[in-house]
Structure formats: C-alpha cells, structure tokens
Amino acid sequence: MAIRIVGVDLPQNKRGEIALTYVYGIGRSSSAKILDKAGVDRDVKVKDWTDDQAAKIREIIGAEYKVEGDLRSEVQLNIKRLMDIGCYRGVRHRIGLPVRGQSTKNNARTRKGRKKTVANKKKATK
C-alpha cells in the first residue's frame, strides 16, 4: 500500500529519511527532525511503517511545516512582491538575469536561455 503524504506518494523501498525528501519543502535535516518527533526510526523503509506512524508523520508535517503548494505559492508571491516594488532583485527577476550578483559577460545561460546569435557587420569594400 502506497503511503501518501501531502499529495505525494512516497517510494516504498527507500528509507524514511530519504523518502520524505520527495515532498517539496522537506530536506534531509527536516525529515530527520520529523521522524525523531514521530518516534520512527530513520532507517526503517517506508513499506514497514505502520498506519499509526504514517498518521503521526502526516500530523507533524501538517501542523509545523509549509510544504508543496502552499510553499510554492509563497515563494512566487515573494518574487512578485520584489518585482512590484521595483528593487534591484525584482528588476533582475523581471528581465530574466541572475539575481545574486553573478557575472553575465560570458555565462549565465541557465537564466538567460539559449544563445541568440547576432550577425556580424559587413566590412565596407573599397
């Protein structure tokens, strides 16, 4: 039986600590804290969890963590707020350039997209 937490099916054959990282907003350290609080051993595979353990984990995540859709929308709203107030970071987001001070002379292709080739100017003939 697949265990579903906040709309994400956890992989059955992985350790609990790793499986919880499939949820957006939960990393290794958060998953370790959640499992410790729920009283579940980190090394137990997901398929070996009892229904009570899964329910306890769901309860902890629901009460203490902002994950999946809520977190994604909060991040989007934060970026939109930066763009609306017109600060440097917001402007960089708006024009699609790196936000954190990286150089853009040669690289930054991930943020800028594919290279746009510009034709050379033809030399004047005598």
UniProtKB/Swiss-Prot annotation:
PROSITE patterns: RIBOSOMAL_S13_1, RIBOSOMAL_S13_2. Part of the 30S ribosomal subunit. Forms a loose heterodimer with protein S19. Forms two bridges to the 50S subunit in the 70S ribosome. The keyword Ribosomal protein applies. This is Small ribosomal subunit protein uS13. GO terms for molecular function: rRNA binding; structural constituent of ribosome; tRNA binding. Gene3D superfamilies: 1.10.8.50, 30s ribosomal protein s13, domain 2. Keywords: Ribonucleoprotein, Ribosomal protein, RNA-binding, rRNA-binding, tRNA-binding. NCBIfam families: uS13_bact. SUPFAM superfamilies: S13-like H2TH domain. Belongs to the universal ribosomal protein uS13 family. GO terms for biological process: translation. The gene is rpsM. Located at the top of the head of the 30S subunit, it contacts several helices of the 16S rRNA. In the 70S ribosome it contacts the 23S rRNA (bridge B1a) and protein L5 of the 50S subunit (bridge B1b), connecting the 2 subunits; these bridges are implicated in subunit movement. Contacts the tRNAs in the A and P-sites. The keyword DNA-binding does not apply. GO terms for cellular component: cytosol; small ribosomal subunit.
